[in-house]
A protein has these predicted regions:
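Anaerobic metallocofactor- and corrinoid-dependent redox/one-carbon enzyme cores
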Residues: 1-207
Length: 207
């Protein structure tokens, strides 16, 4: 089972700008929802032959239900500004502290093209590939739903994924890449996705 709970994160992080207090508030709020779901899952398991394998606590965003906005509510600054790393770390710590049977990533996900605020900051270039890679040191994923110019070369992709792999090996943690080269689009041009789960953004020049 999994959660789409960026709204819960936003409410908890908006309650305090002290990292320890915000982390505790998130642990409490998300923990209440998680335990309630786990109780339901346990009852279903008893009544059926289904096996409850655990709960992925990753607070997945979806467009306007934004994890980027939740982080900005804590930092009082645009995503990518100083304080973003701290917010990412405290969210991750809160998730890991919730006493339920966890499965999947159970970590912070920052998918650029699935979150209105993240896509907006990408367009504004307040956050870059290298920053997203740095945040992955304290998150559950690596480079997640990153839009790239369609003329990116194989060598550039190799270097980008290689940097992520280097970090994964150094930190002894799995990281993944969902990179989206947009065919026919160049840097400074805007994507034109019509997918209901994706947000459009302006492509950044490659570093």
């Amino acid at each position: 089972m999994a959660l789409q709970s960026a709204n819960v994160v936003a409410e908890a992080l908006g309650s305090s700008h002290n990292p320890a207090a915000a982390q505790k508030a998130l642990e409490t709020a998300l923990g209440e929802h998680a335990r309630a779901i786990e109780n339901i899952a346990g009852n279903i398991e008893k009544q059926t032959r289904w096996k409850y394998a655990g709960l992925d606590l990753s607070p997945a965003p979806l467009k306007e239900v934004s994890i980027g906005a939740a982080i900005e509510g804590f930092t009082k600054a645009k995503f990518g500004s100083s304080g973003t790393m701290t917010a990412a770390a405290l969210i991750t710590a809160a998730l890991h502290a919730i006493p339920v049977k966890q499965a999947g990533y159970s970590g912070l996900m920052l998918p650029i093209l699935e979150d209105y605020t993240l896509a907006r900051r990408w367009t504004e270039r307040t956050v870059t590939v290298d920053q997203m890679l740095a945040y992955s040191a304290v998150c559950g994923t690596g480079l997640d739903v990153i839009p790239l110019p369609g003329d990116i070369s194989v060598e550039q992709l190799e270097r980008m994924i290689g940097d992520m792999a280097t970090l994964a090996v150094k930190l002894h943690k799995p990281l993944s890449a969902r990179l989206l080269p947009v065919a026919g689009k160049k840097a400074s041009e805007r994507t034109e996705f019509e997918d209901p789960f994706l947000v459009n953004a302006t492509l950044q020049p490659l570093p």
